Amino acid sequence: MATEGDVMTDHLQGVERAAPGEVRVRRALLSVSDKSGIVELAQGLAELGVELVSTGGTARELAGAGIAVRAIEDFTGFPEMMDGRVKTLHPRLYAGLLARRDEDEHLRAAGEHEIEQVDLVCVNLYPFEQTVARGDASEAEVIENIDIGGPTMIRAAAKNSAFAAVLVDPGDYQQVLAELRESDGRLSLSTRKALAGKAFACTARYDAAISTWFAAHEGEGFPESWRESYEKVTDLRYGENPHQQAAFYARVGSPTHLLAGVEQLHGKELSFNNLLDLSSARELVEEFAEPACAIVKHNNPCGCAIGDSGREAYESAFACDPESAYGGVIAVNRPVDLAFAEALGKQFIEVLLAPGYDAAALEALQVKKNVRLLELSDWPEPLREVESKPVIGGQLVQTHDVVAETREQMSTMTARQPTEDEWRDMLFAWTVCRHVRSNAIVLAADGATIGIGAGQMSRVDAVRIAVQKAEKFRGGRESDPLAGASLASDAYFPFADGPQLALDAGIAAIIQPGGSVRDEEVVAAVDAAGAAMVATGVRHFRH
């Protein structure tokens, strides 16, 4: 029967020459924050004759399950200290992880210093991201959840993947066990390399989350170095066009993302373009507390409205531009009932997002084979994160376009003051205008858009298109929708021609940033028409 001394001799004899493809797993170090599946992994390894070395809470978890483990203190000959801040940071461990087993000098040094080889490391990290995402963690608590030893072990084992394996994802445990069982305790070099790549992605993500947190606490302005990490949520069939590959990634450290909490109840897979439009539609309806609906096409709203119900808001939004709404993405901030579902009628839509659907509505909508029905029952607070746009070889980074804007902060530029109804429609149009690609013009009446001019290089062309839309579709009204309507412009009017075109069509109130060198000319044109105009002092370009 082997004595404790015999076991130690076996450890020393474990220093052996090996080629990169010929490594048998004889010793594993397990140290995890997320204990999911760790007992099953340890049991499987033990059944294969693998010696288990473990730390702190992981060792207690395994011992509680009746699994024999060797404490890290016994392995390193050095106690854990400083409330667990120092437990694995020791040359005996890292020499065992990093030794090249095809190098005589490495093997000589390992033998001389009685280094024991570690063939597999299973580590996952302190929950830094989850701690930050809680929102109520103190700075001290956040700092304590920065893992030091874990990333160091992961990187060491990943660097030496020619001779060691590293596990960072509980989802890989059973696959690794299966290969070990099938291969007489060995993991292939290809498996070890794949695990190493995953490990470095894990530590990169972790460091990016920490870096982002520190950058956010540096004060005003942007840090000298900008790092972000993203994790794949899903592959997409293709990108904007069929010849482009695509996937959707969520930003690491973000408290939510576009599809978080979204359940798809019906329809085909979401496409790249669906997700772009869905994000725009959702951001727009999240602006309103009252029932609201937005219909988006090619990342621009072609209709938006508020109403007494989701159905009423939808019908008003659709009436703005029923031609462009064909194949659109719809977001509504109220549950969909049968009346709403029936109002959709034969309209072809790509996506419908709502907080819920009653049974009758769902049954009626599922007749539309291809429509993607999405439910987001718990709408989180809108994100106001820093945003970035790719340019050649880099990123443009900016704060989100959100600024406190109240009626009291705005100034009337004209002789006539706006009426209360005009204020209501101007503020509604101004809110929608911020979500339209520049140059942007939004015409509104009675809490609904009646014409939108989007993405024009010329502001007067944007006005012309918005007026033409209103004249063509009339916002679903029998009477002239432009008579007494309001206009919002995302930037100032450089000339009086744009406002004049709108005034001639019947617009009675205008809201715009102001600040043009020709403001006096613009004001004179509006005064001459007996209309009202308000300056916000804030521009809302969107590209």
Where do the protein language model's features map onto the residues?
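N-terminal glycine-/serine-/threonine-rich phosphate-binding loop
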Residues: A2-F75
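ATP-dependent carboxylate/acyl-activation modules
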Residues: T9-L30, V123-Y126, Y206-A208, T212-H543
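Glycine-rich nucleotide/cofactor/substrate-binding loop typically near the N-terminus or early
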Residues: G57-F128
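Mobile "lid/hinge" segments at catalytic clefts and subdomain interfaces of large enzymes
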Residues: T152-M153, N160-V176
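Active-site/ligand-binding-proximal alpha/beta "capping" segment
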Residues: R101-P151, R155-A158, T406, S411-E420
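Anion (oxyanion) recognition and catalysis
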Residues: A46, A63, D147, A158, ...
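Short, hydrophobic/aliphatic alpha-helical segments
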Residues: V39-L48, E129-I146, P151-T152, A281, ...
